[in-house]
């Protein structure tokens, strides 16, 4: 794969990513077949593999005990996100789950963050967006949301740009307890 392939996938919809793969790599499969193949891998990962990062549950428990309202705003399909949240027993910490598909816009637009804010009923200036992808951090920052980032190996290529936009940066979830 090309070295910047993750950059393209982070910013594109599933269909857009399939078009990119088809054109870039000359794939013979239809866009629908490519999407189906990619989704089966994603479904497996969310249903069976993805684990919480160390100290995530402790952080969620502390926030919940402090009465902090939380919801999920994700680019992931609802069924995949729910499968992981339920399997990891952390769905209970969130009052709602919003997906880009259901909102009708990717995280290059602030729609999902605005919907989450409306649901939570909290002031924008105290409603932190936790993000790990540069395009979503840029969107949340431009929409005047405070942004918290946790250093992520998957986002290492964008680390400097993410840090420049973040209001709070933590090296890991364990560091949250020091705030």
Where are these regions (language model features)?
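N-terminal helical cap/lid subdomain that shapes the substrate entry/recognition surface
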Residues: 1-57, 62-66
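Short, flexible loop segments at the rims of nucleotide/cofactor-binding pockets, characterized by
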Residues: 46-51, 75, 147-149
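Asp-based, Mg2+/Mn2+-dependent phosphohydrolase catalytic module
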Residues: 57, 61-64, 68, 77-179
């Amino acid at each position: 794969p090309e070295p910047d392939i993750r950059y393209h996938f982070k910013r594109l919809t599933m269909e857009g990513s399939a078009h990119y793969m088809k054109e870039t790599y000359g794939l013979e499969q239809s866009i629908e077949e490519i999407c189906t193949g990619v989704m089966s891998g994603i479904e497996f990962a969310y249903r069976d593999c993805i684990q919480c990062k160390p100290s995530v549950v402790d952080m969620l428990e502390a926030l919940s005990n402090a009465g902090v309202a939380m919801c999920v705003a994700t680019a992931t399909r609802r069924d995949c996100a729910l499968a992981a949240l339920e399997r990891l027993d952390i769905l209970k910490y969130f009052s709602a789950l919003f997906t880009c598909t259901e909102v009708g816009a990717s995280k290059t637009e602030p729609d999902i963050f605005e919907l989450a804010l409306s649901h939570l009923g909290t002031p924008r200036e105290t409603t932190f967006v936790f993000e790990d992808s540069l395009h979503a951090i840029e969107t949340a920052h431009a929409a005047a949301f405070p942004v918290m980032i946790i250093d992520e190996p998957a986002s290492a290529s964008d680390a400097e740009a993410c840090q420049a936009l973040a209001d709070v940066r933590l090296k890991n979830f364990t560091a949250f307890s020091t705030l």
